[in-house]
């Protein structure tokens, strides 16, 4: 069976593993998911990510980040633009997550960017997800 929204599946797996205090979470690999993982690592929400060969295709594994007392680095995740309702933002109207404390992940003509990077470049695009 095909998956209609692989990004939502990735965020759900990440949210569930984070809630259960798992150290790692695995999911089917795609280039888009690996770019999202790069952003999550650069923003400090995950420790690292790796791509492994599986029996069928490739597998993306994320190492979750926790604080000294097992506090979660990711407080919340939300899929914004969905297959049934796409959400776009102009460069002049980019979303701010929790007043700048969180990150909005955008798909732009310059690739996947955070809201801050898109603001610096002056580009808008599809708002994929919020992470805080």
From Swiss-Prot:
Pfam families on file: Ribosomal_S8
Recorded family membership: Belongs to the universal ribosomal protein uS8 family.
GO molecular function: rRNA binding; structural constituent of ribosome
Gene: rpsH
Function summary: One of the primary rRNA binding proteins, it binds directly to 16S rRNA central domain where it helps coordinate assembly of the platform of the 30S subunit.
GO biological process: translation
Protein name from the UniProt record: Small ribosomal subunit protein uS8
Gene Ontology cellular-component terms listed: ribonucleoprotein complex; ribosome
Assembly behavior: Part of the 30S ribosomal subunit. Contacts proteins S5 and S12.
Record organism: Kineococcus radiotolerans (strain ATCC BAA-149 / DSM 14245 / SRS30216)
Keyword line: Ribonucleoprotein, Ribosomal protein, RNA-binding, rRNA-binding
């Amino acid at each position: 069976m095909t998956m209609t929204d692989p990004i939502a599946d990735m965020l759900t797996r990440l949210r569930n593993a984070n809630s259960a205090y798992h150290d790692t979470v695995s999911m089917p690999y795609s280039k888009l998911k690996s770019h999202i993982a790069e952003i999550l690592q650069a923003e400090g929400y995950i420790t690292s990510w790796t791509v492994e060969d599986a029996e069928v295709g490739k597998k993306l594994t994320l190492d979750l980040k926790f604080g000294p007392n097992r506090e979660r680095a990711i407080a919340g995740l939300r899929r914004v633009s969905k297959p049934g309702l796409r959400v776009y933002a102009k460069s002049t109207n980019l979303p701010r997550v929790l007043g700048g404390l969180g990150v909005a992940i955008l798909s732009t003509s310059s690739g996947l960017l955070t809201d801050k990077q898109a603001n610096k470049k002056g580009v808008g695009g599809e708002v994929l997800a919020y992470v805080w």
